[in-house]
């Protein structure tokens, strides 16, 4: 719900095991279990420090950069420091990826017993669920986090144990990858080099050519991102020798209603 460079902040995490081609979900929990640090756990260089300062010392801020390999490195190291367990990789998926899994495997049940079809799941998880759990602290907030984790767990297990036609699941997974909603970082350098050549890596461009990316981070913790719309327009100017003047217009609009929910 709160924007970070790679999508949203880490609110739910899980541990999975891949053994002889079989993937199992060992544990899913909320960020309440995760212990923050006094300083960032990985030194990603002076440019990174200048941009983000000490904020990535918190688990929920380790993906402020849009470069997912940075997030993967930090989350893996933070998990090792907290638990002593070394991870082989980090898989990131957001609520849109969950929607695509629901498209293939069926609707989910909301907190009040209501049926949530796939095309309403993102809206429910980013907005509607707060009407079902109308407090942002205390036991009600904890219950909301647990319920969100339950939805994610259910959809992951459905996908892992999917017995339907691959023709219905694979296109949804492909949409997740090409849209940047399903990302993977590997702790094995050789594997990561291969991943970096694909959309699955979520890596920012290292090309020496001009490159521009709009990146937003919510530092207020207010869950209001649902009401933010973004529009970016790029206008390329005529080439003048080795140079060209271009214009980028960014419009951020607050659509919060004047009253009501």
Model feature map: region roles:
Residues 1-261:
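Non-catalytic, solvent-exposed segments at the cell envelope interface
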């Amino acid at each position: 719900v709160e924007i970070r460079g790679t999508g949203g902040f880490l609110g739910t995490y899980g541990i999975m095991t891949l053994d002889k081609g079989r993937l199992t979900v060992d544990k899913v929990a909320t960020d309440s279990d995760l212990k923050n640090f006094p300083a960032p756990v990985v030194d990603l260089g002076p440019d990174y420090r200048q941009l983000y300062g000490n904020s990535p010392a918190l688990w929920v801020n380790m993906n402020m950069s849009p470069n997912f390999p940075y997030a993967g490195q930090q989350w893996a190291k933070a998990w090792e420091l907290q638990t002593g367990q070394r991870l082989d990789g980090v898989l990131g998926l957001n609520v849109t990826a969950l929607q695509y899994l629901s498209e293939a495997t069926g609707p989910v049940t909301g907190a009040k017993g209501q049926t949530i079809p796939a095309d309403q799941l993102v809206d429910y998880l980013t907005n509607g669920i707060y009407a079902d759990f109308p407090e942002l602290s205390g036991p009600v907030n904890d219950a909301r986090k647990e319920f969100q984790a339950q939805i994610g767990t259910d959809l992951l297990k459905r996908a892992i144990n999917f017995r339907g036609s691959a023709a219905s699941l694979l296109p949804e997974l492909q949409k997740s990858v090409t849209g940047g909603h399903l990302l993977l970082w590997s702790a094995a350098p050789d594997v990561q080099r291969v991943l970096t050549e694909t959309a699955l890596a979520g890596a920012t461009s290292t090309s020496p050519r001009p490159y521009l990316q709009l990146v937003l981070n919510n530092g207020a913790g207010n869950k209001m991102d649902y009401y933010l719309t973004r529009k970016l327009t790029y206008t390329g100017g005529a080439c003048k020798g080795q140079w060209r003047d271009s214009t980028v217009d960014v419009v951020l609009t607050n659509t919060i209603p004047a009253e009501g929910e």
